Amino acid sequence: MSKVLVLKSSIMAQHSHTNQMADFFIEKWQTNHADDSITVRDLTAQSIPALDNELVHALRPSGNEMTARQKETLALSDELIAELQDNDVIVITAPMYNFHIPTQLKSYFDMIARAGVTFRYTENGPEGLLKGKQVIILTSRGGIHKDGPSDLLVPYLRLFLSFIGLTDIEFVFTEGVALGPDAANQAQQTAREVLQAIAS
């Protein structure tokens, strides 16, 4: 039995193309893997704080007494990391906003990037500690950006996730959704076909 974690980061709720693709994937995965468990975490529904001068020290404990905010942040970071460690398949929705990922997803990444916990420094360089997991990234874009210079999202996600040990990454694209109904429908259909194959 596998455990699947779905991380939603779109601010568009039911109007989100990536949320629709995530829900489609969940449906197909449950059909084909009835014994597997699926956990859904909506990063827009829970407030994940942006790091500031106070909170960054919560993730780098020095032995000093922590403030209430720092304690809450460290507890949240521990919870999010434990959730990642406990799951085998990680599905991340990552719509392109202004050529990059949503703020909510960036704040999540800041919570889980912790030296000695999700990565460590060795004499041979940094080593990611979240190994042996499958990552599926669902990304939607209003225009066509795949493999072009405007696609900053894919290389960033590959770099960050590989840094913490998540190297088995597959991207599923829903592109051109702002180019008219026909283009949007075709993009969704193409993404569904890919997701159906992954979930089989």
From Swiss-Prot:
- The EC number(s) attached to this protein equal 1.6.5.-, 1.7.1.17
Give yes or no: UniProt keyword Oxidoreductase. Answer: yes
Which Cys pairs does UniProt list as disulfide-bonded? none
Write out the entry's keywords from A to Z.
Flavoprotein, FMN, NAD, Oxidoreductase
Q: Where does the chain bind FMN? A: 10, 96-99, 140-143
The lineage's top-level taxon is Bacteria
Q: Which GO terms describe its molecular function?
A: electron transfer activity; FMN binding; oxidoreductase activity, acting on NAD(P)H as acceptor; oxidoreductase activity, acting on NAD(P)H, quinone or similar compound as acceptor
- Please share the entry's free-text remark on the cofactor: Binds 1 FMN per subunit.
Keyword check for Phosphoprotein: no
Q: What cofactor does this chain's UniProt record say it requires?
A: FMN
Quote the Pfam families the UniProt record gives. Flavodoxin_2 (PF02525)
Under catalytic activity, the entry for this protein gives: 2 a quinone + NADH + H(+) = 2 a 1,4-benzosemiquinone + NAD(+); N,N-dimethyl-1,4-phenylenediamine + anthranilate + 2 NAD(+) = 2-(4-dimethylaminophenyl)diazenylbenzoate + 2 NADH + 2 H(+)
The EC category is oxidoreductase
Q: Which HAMAP family match?
A: Azoreductase_type1
User: What biological function has been recorded for the protein in this entry?
Assistant: Quinone reductase that provides resistance to thiol-specific stress caused by electrophilic quinones.
In the record, the note on similarity to other proteins reads:
Belongs to the azoreductase type 1 family.
What is annotated about its quaternary structure and interactions? Homodimer.
Q: Record's PANTHER family?
A: FMN-DEPENDENT NADH-AZOREDUCTASE 1, FMN-DEPENDENT NADH:QUINONE OXIDOREDUCTASE
Q: What is the protein name stated in its UniProt record?
A: FMN-dependent NADH:quinone oxidoreductase
Query: Which gene is the coding source of this polypeptide chain?
Result: azoR
